[in-house]
Amino acid sequence: MLGAAWIAGRAVLPAIAASRNGRLISIASRDPERARAMASQHSIPNVASDYDEVLADDDVDAVYIPLVNSLHREWTERSLAAGKHVLCEKPLGMNAGEAEAMAEASRRSGRLLMEAFMYRFHPRMQAFVDGLGIDDRPLHVQASFGFPLSDPSNYRLQPQLGGGALLDVGCYTVSVARWLLGEPDTVLARARTDRATGVDMSVSALLHFSGGGTASLWCSFESAEEQSVTAVTPKGTFSLERPFTAWQDPHDPFQLMVESFADSVMSRSDPAITLDESIANMRVLDRIRDEMRI
């Protein structure tokens, strides 16, 4: 574990500990006290002095990277070069160029790299997508993800760290729209930005797809808790509430994700979320950002 981020302690460490095919070996953090606390809480046998010590540990087969977005590429590439497989938090990189470089590093090293989009593994999300069926391809998709955030010290509000609503939660809305409709041929977008930092606080995007479908996407750090996905089809309208963070109800998508990742590592097979998929998602995020003009 490279880093002791909130999501690691809240979800990923328990998922690995409960998984059928993984175990926790080592953790490092810029905050040693935080690392020691997490190690104690989750029975991690080793607290490393720094990230490089984790990467030098022969007992470590794979690393999970929950670092801020601006550090994803550096530590993914260093981990791959050290012979470790990598499960990296979303978004994979700061832009498509970074994602492409990370994918090349994975191919060059012969080690697996997967983006940690845990919502893709939840049975209720998979059932929603499968239930639409090939003959019920949506005419229109609406996806939203918002929550209130105002603490200026939060990394999500710091542009140099890859902050902003689009990369943090908008990546989910783009992912689900592409999952249902394919790749867009037209992208329009607008954003509300924080005047002091320039970080995008709310983003609206309209996408048109080559198959004729459309999508309206919205993400925000200014709203009350809000997330949903709706698919309008010729046979009806289907909606799913809390599609992106439905933890432990009763399935744990984080555990399903880490088990799938470990299965791919051990079988030397492509991961459930391929690098081509992750790069394509970053390209659409880049197009939205270009339209936002920030």
Task: Indicate residue ranges for each PLM-predicted region.
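Contiguous beta-strand/loop segments that form the cofactor/metal-binding neighborhood of enzyme cores
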Residues: 175-244, 259-265
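N-terminal Rossmann-like dinucleotide-binding module
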Residues: 1-42, 262, 294
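Predominantly a Rossmann-like dinucleotide-binding segment in NAD(P)-dependent oxidoreductases
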Residues: 119-188, 195
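C-terminal helix-rich "cap/oligomerization" subdomain common to oxidoreductases
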Residues: 62-64, 210, 260-294
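Rossmann-fold dehydrogenase core element
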Residues: 100-118, 136-143
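Beta-loop-alpha module in the N-terminal Rossmann-like domain of NAD(P)-dependent dehydrogenases
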Residues: 42-105
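Hydrophobic residues in well-ordered beta-strands that form the structural core
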Residues: 8, 48, 88, 113-115, ...
